[in-house]
């Protein structure tokens, strides 16, 4: 049945989502989570009819009765169809119990249940339940847990329908709510302009922290070891043009590491370049990291007060790296500044805010807060401490929040100056106490209605994380490229090039980019001279790219990190070998062709008929092997009777993944019981055929 979202219905009725949610709860007894929740289209039509005739009380009363009858009927139909039961309001508890009593053959179980508990609910002897499980090929002891699907199949044997317990259904609701939590409210009436979040990047000692220090009119630099930033700090600065939130990072590595975790919190990057030093290796890396993240760059040409300052030389070098200054006909804003004399600072802030204005940054301060973790740490006296950026909504002391896979209730909140505050709006950095564990930089946070909800959502997040780790997406590699890299409908191969001399870098970049075709786009994300470092691996991981090295090797730390992050590093001595490998990988990116490969044969020697399972074939493997995952053919007198899949494969009573030549096995075929002695079971699989370029 078609569904209607609450916010769509509220628009049709000319009411706010919140007002409609209250009406549904108070007048109809329908509980919905938020504006993204859905109800049946039939129910929506009835609600529209009732609200349009709200002046006629008698009519309204009749309609409510009719509506309640239809809801009751709907619930019964859903139960008959084994649709999972939704969370009910406490007021409907008695009504639910009466409905349960109407179904003698319906039981309610959780996502997992022990064999003993299932037998109790079915009111059957444990031995009978275990027997049915054995017929299904599941060997489970009395206290062993089985999943919902298996429980349903066992219950069906006893003519009992199974529905999932409300708590489990509620968890799925929570999961759905969690996934929708980042969607913005359709009603933009309460949205306001928010301050931009700016990250300051640049080469070491080019004056990043000094510049920010000058803007904030405070003294941070002196407190940090060696004058180099030791942590990720976030600061809000008030200017005449408005507020700006600055992230002072320990370099672009942190920026990219957070981007690799899906954290897109930076609106604008201020790239600091020393006027007397020009573009340096870390400056070049920072430029490439920003381009990979599609973040606009404002260049601050610092130290213009120094005798050796040469602004035009810096602009020339920027042009060589694709950043053409506005006064040279490009679109990159370049502002000469001096952190020491404070010259040009107002202009830098003005240009940054102007860049942000073009992006039309807005947020809704009235909604529940959400945002991103900048850093997390464990304080001996205060417990887990997290620095956050609020990206939407307003965060308040006492809010229950989920942060990544941890949760908690905010006990205290501090601003960037260490002052205790009670609330924080969009783009405001804060430090909070009250989490159950230390979150990681880049984790998303969300405010939820209570701590119980946060705890449940954290459990769901942990489950999802565990599942994602088990079936994690592999990083791109030359060996398996076609299924890994896609940019919309255009396939893309990202490459980071490192070489021993600059001439090799440029030659390799040009050669690789010429390999681009309509099917595959080759993009060199970053190219530089020197050994392959951890920074290269971090960028490759975040951009899902491969690293190609010419006459250079990865250092030990880079190799270890690449293995951990599953980043593919290839080193060569000859450029043509690399080009051939890239061509081969691009061929692999095209849709593969498959051929059939027979992996084994088995002869059916005995037939066993089991009422609850069907026909079990006792076989002897005559060649190759039979695997549980392979496709099979049943061949009788040289004629193929069936092509299908195995339902089970066993050695004695144990499930087997494969059975080799010379061994006996028992097997059943999915949806096929007409097996006869003397039949041949042929196992085969489809393998990819290497394509010619």
From Swiss-Prot:
Pfam families per the UniProt record, alphabetical: EF-G_D2, GTP_EFTU, IF-2, IF2_N
Annotated transmembrane regions: none
Protein location: Cytoplasm
InterPro entries on file: EF-G-like_DII (IPR053905), IF2_II (IPR044145), IF2_N (IPR006847), P-loop_NTPase (IPR027417), Small_GTP-bd (IPR005225), T_Tr_GTP-bd_dom (IPR000795), TF_IF2_bacterial-like (IPR000178), TIF_IF2 (IPR015760)
Primary location group: cytoplasm
Region of interest (G4), residue spans: 302-305
Keyword Cytoplasm appears in the UniProt entry: yes
Alphabetical keyword list: Cytoplasm, GTP-binding, Initiation factor, Nucleotide-binding, Protein biosynthesis
GO cellular-component term (any): cytosol
Extent of Acidic residues compositional bias: 92-102
GO MF annotation list: GTP binding; GTPase activity; translation initiation factor activity
Region (G3): 248-251
Region of interest called G5, as start-end residue ranges on this chain: 338-340
All residue ranges annotated as the tr-type G domain in the record: 193-362
Positions contributing to GTP binding: 202-209, 248-252, 302-305
SUPFAM superfamilies in UniProt: Initiation factor IF2/eIF5b, domain 3, P-loop containing nucleoside triphosphate hydrolases, Translation proteins
Domain of life, source organism: Bacteria
PROSITE patterns cross-referenced by the UniProt entry: G_TR_2, IF2
Residue span of region Disordered: 78-102
Segments of this protein annotated with the region G1: 202-209
Role according to the record: One of the essential components for the initiation of protein synthesis. Protects formylmethionyl-tRNA from spontaneous hydrolysis and promotes its binding to the 30S ribosomal subunits. Also involved in the hydrolysis of GTP during the formation of the 70S ribosomal complex.
Similarity comment text for this entry: Belongs to the TRAFAC class translation factor GTPase superfamily. Classic translation factor GTPase family. IF-2 subfamily.
NCBIfam families: IF-2, small_GTP
Stored PANTHER family: TR-TYPE G DOMAIN-CONTAINING PROTEIN, TRANSLATION INITIATION FACTOR IF-2-RELATED
Protein name, UniProt field: Translation initiation factor IF-2
Organism: Clostridium acetobutylicum (strain ATCC 824 / DSM 792 / JCM 1419 / IAM 19013 / LMG 5710 / NBRC 13948 / NRRL B-527 / VKM B-1787 / 2291 / W)
Biological classification of the source: Bacteria, Bacillati, Bacillota, Clostridia, Eubacteriales
Gene designation per UniProt: infB
